Amino acid sequence: MPEYLSIATHERIEMISIGSQLAELLRKKAEDGWKDGFLAVYSPHTTCGLTINEGWDPDVMADMESFLAARVPQDWGFRHAEGNSDAHIKTSFFGSSVLVPVADGRPDLGQWQAVYLCESDGPRVRTLRVSFLKEA
């Protein structure tokens, strides 16, 4: 049975670490005996993606935001004219899902890694679907 996370974003373009929310879901699942496998985290939004990247130095996410803003400006002159065309393109750089390994009830990421929600058309409240996959 999937769980759902609601994440409030506060800026038009924003990278938000969701590790603490995922850890809380894992704590609840561990109480039910689920400790090893994978979390499949999915964003059903076309202007908000997910990525796993550097989690220690916040300048990495700031650089990503600046890079995308420079390469895909909001006023580029898109044919899609709803005003958020750049957000659709930016989201495609990240994708709509990540698979997070879990060991002993905790995310088993690399030393510097973190899971990020990548907002491209905020501020909004985003809903993420989290599925728990047991190892065979």
Task: Enumerate the language-model features and the residues they cover.
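Active-site histidine-anchored catalytic micro-motif
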Residues: 1-136
